[in-house]
Swiss-Prot record:
This is Uncharacterized protein YppG. Pfam families: YppG. The gene is yppG. InterPro entries: YppG. It comes from the Bacteria.
């Protein structure tokens, strides 16, 4: 395939690189040859060399800060203003239907959590 002229020793019908020879010699002699039919292929079919890995220079990873740094000159909006801004339409008017739906969902969730806590504490009495 690549025309490489490297020669590796052949053991039990297969070619192994020099550093791998000791690992495969530990098997029972002739075991693999008895179990598998020998197939003779050219050396280029067994070994496809890879380009040598070049060491990369160590560089610190670049991460962006996920938490914005508050600016001392800018006034942060109050928590109430921040919550209320979630219920504004694109034209700037408040969406009262969305407010009421969200309030109903919060109340329903609180009722369920309250019942769950009540049942959980009665279990330990």
């Amino acid at each position: 395939m690549n025309g490489s002229s490297r020669s590796y020793p052949r053991q039990m019908g297969y070619y192994y690189p020099q550093h791998m020879q000791g690992y495969y010699q530990q098997a029972a002699p002739g075991y693999l040859e008895q179990q598998l039919p020998q197939q003779h292929y050219g050396q280029q079919d067994y070994y496809q060399p890879y380009a040598p890995i070049q060491p990369m220079p160590m560089q610190p990873p670049v991460f962006s800060n996920p938490y914005p740094i508050p600016r001392p000159n800018q006034q942060q909006p109050s928590q109430f203003q921040s919550i209320m801004s979630q219920f504004k339409k694109a034209n700037g008017q408040f969406d009262f239907n969305k407010m009421m739906d969200t309030t109903g969902q919060v109340m329903s969730a609180m009722n369920q959590v309250g019942s769950l806590i009540k049942g959980f504490t009665s279990f330990f009495k």
